[in-house]
Design a protein with these regions (language model features):
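Noncatalytic, beta-rich nucleic-acid-contacting surfaces in large DNA/RNA-processing enzymes
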Residues: 1-429
Length: 429
């Protein structure tokens, strides 16, 4: 969602063409600073880090420290080890904590009768372990380095944040974590390594060697007939994001005939929105009627056949129906994405009142909001889906036009995964 990033060649996706909203990246109402994610092939990421250090100076660049905290099970095990509780007892107690992500010890004592019984009726040592673990839970346990986060300062980083030498790298590391770094005005850059970009790069080198044809991935036509046929037939094993059995089945039913269909499928094929894939397919092929609550909604939902698929569509509709500013629309998008219930309730009143001021039927408006609340559970942004579909199309194009050279690269980059090697070898046959 940035014209500047497009013009500089940081991204090859033209935001205006695909309706990507700038307000997701920058807007006057945004409180937090944006961060910038850039994907490189594996070799390119290392080169970029070296380039940044050389260009700006080693003392201007730093990786970002992360802090690992004691979760419920680890708190029990750590305290048990220090208090010399036998390891089998330690593992037994930790095993009584429900396996649900984010479960605290307080919740565990409420949900697990066995664990609660140990707290109330266990041995003196077990009670001591559990009570101390309860106090220590959430404490910082260790430090690490953010997998891809880097900050670049206008001068010596230590003028802004405390730094330390990194034990695993020759780059400095901040002693503040990401949120604190943002509070002093530093912007985080994420330099990500994506193996599929390495596969594309090596496949293009294979093609050049065997055919003398130089393929430039950024110039691959996104309406290429042979590539779209490959998607329509579900022959996407070895491609980016579209190789699962479920996705292949949906592609055969959808028969995508334009790049935008692939963007939508990438967003829909996730827990939650998957339930709407049959409706999406039936509406595309005219087997199900496309219904809009208000005529104005067609402008924003026609590309997804009347189904709200992207966060950006909610942003656009909130502006069109209720008169939200672009900044307010992004605030709604963020509240949905991060499940900020309190913020959503505040915006609900503004949305209802704004729609009423524009003479929209309240019952229908209430229904739209309730649909959006459900949508918040799985909301995905179009900017990400477009980028993923773009890389997926490049991989599919190479497979469709140069199968030997492409699959050779796929196999080379999966040599350590016996299961994938078996699957991809079978695909090559």
């Amino acid at each position: 969602g940035s014209v500047v990033a497009y013009c500089l060649g940081i991204t090859a996706i033209e935001p205006l063409k695909y309706g990507l909203l700038f307000e997701r990246f920058l807007n006057p109402d945004r409180i937090s600073l944006p961060d910038i994610d850039v994907d490189f092939d594996d070799e390119g990421r290392a080169k970029t880090l070296a380039y940044v250090r050389e260009k700006y100076g080693a003392d201007h660049v730093a990786q970002i420290t992360t802090f690992g905290s004691m979760a419920a099970k680890m708190a029990i095990k750590d305290v048990a080890r220090v208090l010399e509780l036998p390891i089998d007892e330690s593992n037994r107690l930790a095993g009584l904590v429900p396996a649900k992500p984010g479960t605290t010890l307080e919740k565990a004592f409420q949900e697990s009768e066995e664990l609660k019984n140990e707290l109330e009726n266990g041995s003196i040592l077990i009670k001591k372990v559990l009570n101390m673990a309860r106090k220590l839970e959430g404490s910082i346990r260790n430090t690490g380095i953010h997998a891809c986060g880097v900050i670049i300062g206008p001068d010596d980083i230590s003028n802004y944040v405390p730094v330390a030498d990194s034990k695993d790298s020759d780059m400095m590391a901040t002693q503040f974590e990401g949120k604190l770094i943002e509070s002093v005005g530093m912007i985080k850059m994420d330099f990500l390594g994506l193996s599929n970009l390495s596969i594309i790069k090596d496949a293009c080198e294979n093609i050049l060697k065997s055919t003398k044809i130089e393929v430039e991935p950024e110039k691959i036509p996104l309406d290429d007939k042979l590539t779209l046929e490959l998607f329509q037939k579900g022959l996407t094993m070895g491609t980016f994001q579209f190789e699962s059995d479920g996705m292949k089945q949906h592609l055969q039913n959808l028969k995508p005939d334009k790049f935008e269909d692939l963007i939508a499928m990438n967003a829909l094929y996730r827990p939650g929105p998957m339930q709407y894939i049959p409706n999406f397919i039936d509406r595309k092929h005219g087997r199900e009627e496309i219904v809009y609550e208000f005529p104005i909604m067609e402008k924003y939902l026609s590309e997804t056949y009347g189904i709200t698929v992207y966060q950006e569509q909610v942003m656009q509709l909130s502006q069109a129906l209720a008169g939200f500013t672009p900044g307010e629309a992004d605030k709604l998008r963020k509240a949905m994405g991060k499940k900020q219930i309190k913020v959503m309730e505040e915006l609900r009143e503004k949305f209802i009142n704004g729609c009423a001021a524009n003479n929209y039927d309240q019952a229908k408006v209430e229904k739209i909001w309730e649909d959006w609340k459900k949508f918040a559970e799985y909301a995905f942004n179009k900017s990400h889906s477009t980028c993923y579909a773009y890389v997926a199309f490049q991989t599919a194009y190479l497979k469709a036009h140069y199968p030997a050279e492409y699959m050779s690269s796929v196999l080379t980059h999966n040599l350590s995964d016996q299961k994938k090697i078996t699957i991809y070898t079978e695909e090559c046959k």
